[in-house]
Amino acid sequence: MAIPFSYVVRNLGVRKVTTALTASGLALVVYVFATVLMLDAGLRQTLVDTGSPDNALVIRRGAETEVQSGVERAQADVVESQPEVALGSGGERLMSKETVVLISLNKRATEKPSNVVIRGVGPQGLALRPQVRLVEGRMFRPGTSEIIAGRAIGQRFAGAGIGETLRFGMRDWTVVGHFDAGHSGFNSEIWGDADQLIQAFRRNAYSSVIFRLTDAEGLDAVKARLESDPRLTVELKRESIFYAEQSEQLSTFIRYLGVTLSIIFSSGATIGAMITMYASVANRTAEIGTLRALGFRRASILWAFLLESLLLGLLGGILGVALASLMQWVSFSTMNFQTFSELAFSFTLTGKIVVESLIFSLIMGLAGGFLPAIRAARLKIVDSLRAA
């Protein structure tokens, strides 16, 4: 005979203060756990959204980032001649020869310097990134010292407002527009004319070449052709995969740190839940004896106390996820371990994170209630009734 579910729920309500305090402790641990997962998801989304599966990116063989790469002009011309390069509506090749440089700018709030990516793009650079759109001002004019800044850069860095001037590459550059790139990493970049930036930084090669594929499935053919060409020392990747790889080191660090903290904090929360359940068993010894005398089996007693601890864990999990969901409106910036530049992104809550967080809370509840439930199930009827 099973103990009614309403009995289990009623017992949680009887000890309102103890239940609330224990659930709050579990909720704080779940909050930390969920927030770390949201941080990792936001980072991955930002860098994955930066690339498009329809675009191919060419960098120097062995280079891990565009900053480290160098593609000579002659090699870029060979890439441009490939039949897999898509054409625009006007017959132009949808391709951009780009240069990527790191500079140091001061933040508006703290006046402390931080690295920022400067990206020189070709005439088709904007067309290759449909997620990028101008929201203020205008596009820079090719052949001039004009630049446009990502939304995050305009907000965070001094001199990056429209009409303001930044000095780098021994020149003054005027900010003529701000662009929004959705959730992508381009929001943390400054764009200008590629050839002007190459001249300003005294370079003789591009950092990368990006082009739209005529067929997204045709990547392997052009990849094999370019990487086997003896004139070239390049490597070709799908743009979305390239940027996803950029998140690996930072993502791994965040996950390890978050899991470690969650395990440490969960130990305390689990012990708290265990103390609560032991106290519940001690206070209800006579009640347990009465249930046994009425014919309820040991397994029913065990299941009732386990269910009670699981409900306690679930309550803490729901509260923790609710608190963590508020972080979706918080922006965060950190250094990208691959490029050593600042990257701005937001906390992202997904259905998977909600499920994982609730499972985590149930595990804590189960761990905290398992031993007390066994103790309750092992109580003898006579001893329990004597305690009354």
Model-predicted segments: where are they?
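Short, membrane-interfacial amphipathic segments enriched in basic
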Residues: 1-6
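Short juxtamembrane loops and helix-capping segments at transmembrane helix boundaries
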Residues: 328-355
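Short cytosolic juxtamembrane segments of multi-pass membrane proteins
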Residues: 374-388
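Hydrophobic alpha-helical transmembrane segments of multi-pass inner-membrane transport and secretion
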Residues: 16-43, 251-287, 310-319, 363-367
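Transmembrane alpha-helical interface segments in multi-pass membrane proteins
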Residues: 278, 286-332, 356-364, 368, ...
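Hydrophobic, regular-secondary-structure patches
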Residues: 30-117, 136-138, 143, 199, ...
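Short beta-strand boundary microenvironments
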Residues: 114-156
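Mechanotransmission and gating elements of multispan inner-membrane complexes involved in transport
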Residues: 50, 86-87, 106-113, 139, ...
